[in-house]
């Protein structure tokens, strides 16, 4: 299995995948294999005894998070690692600690479009012209 993780990687990528002391910075252009390095590193860590639930991988988009999850799954199967976006991590932390924050467990987070919808509904309920506040 270990050989499969390092197959098709260049020397610098292998070095990043196997890195084990302190932070590792990978600077490279688009399409150069950064996601491949990261997902292979996650698999490498798991193969070397790191508990999957101790691994956290964060990205900016849902598309990138799904791609990373799929790649890790293809390398080592289903894992308990958190692989998601900054927003989904924040939501997970809030949900797991909602009692400390005096929030109900079924709270919702709304975006700017939802806020406008709520404001328009309130204005309508108050018999105010919503166009005046648009």
Labelled PLM ranges:
Residues 1-104, 109:
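P-loop NTPase Walker
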Residues 29, 96-134:
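DNA-processing P-loop NTPase/helicase core
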